[in-house]
């Protein structure tokens, strides 16, 4: 997912600040909810992520008085096409903004974000991805600790695509040093796709994970030689048709970008060499054509 501009998290609107302060004093978030929904740019293709990040950061900074509001927003079951779906998005940023050096607290917050990452609403998942990437430097162990913490997510259809989206964000890749953790996350996602039972092959979560794989691996292979080497190795061993197509797409994307010529060539060669041979029509029995 493209990085969004989230550098400005200070609330600039006096009306929003007053509404937020009122909600914190009273514990009644109805006016705040309505204000955020009106300003969300939803329904529409470009939700106001800068506002979601700013409101989330303000709620996180308020600490315990805001905890009930964040829980309320996170649990709101608003339809994807309504402005009130913005509130779980704000909750994602509030949770992410609360991540700090306390390992136990960070793990608990990450689990709450994981639950939001399983949401069927696409805009909520998008907000979770972006909020995670924003919080990555503040996770215990920094960006490398963050990537390692997301590896288990990659073994899940429900969370895997969100994890890959966050890991593939330029803000994460540019600061990542532990290439083995990147490989572990990508390999876990690939194994999840390959090992899925046939009955799960049309699962929406699996489809999202499969769609996320080429984007993330292309970005990660550009940044990490170990990921590029993983691509060449996996291309030689993968037998699953969907995964092979994803690997072919990664090779094409790297070729278009002019990146990793040695590894992408090795991957392309391995994919060609490991293709199933065409069926010999002379061996087909009558009635099987």
Predicted regions and their residues:
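N-terminal alpha-helical scaffold/docking segments in eukaryotic complex subunits
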Residues: 1-89, 93-98, 246-289
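Residue-level signature of alpha-solenoid helical repeat scaffolds
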Residues: 53, 90-93, 130-131, 165-168, ...
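Extended alpha-helical scaffolding segments
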Residues: 172, 176, 184-265, 273
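Amphipathic alpha-helical repeat scaffolds
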Residues: 21, 37, 52-56, 113-114, ...
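Hydrophobic alpha-helical segments and helix pairs
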Residues: 86, 90-139
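Amphipathic alpha-helical scaffolding segments comprising HEAT/armadillo-like alpha-solenoid repeats
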Residues: 29-37, 60-77, 100-115, 137-151, ...
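Short coil turns that connect the paired helices of HEAT/ARM alpha-solenoid repeats
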Residues: 11, 26, 38-46, 75-86, ...
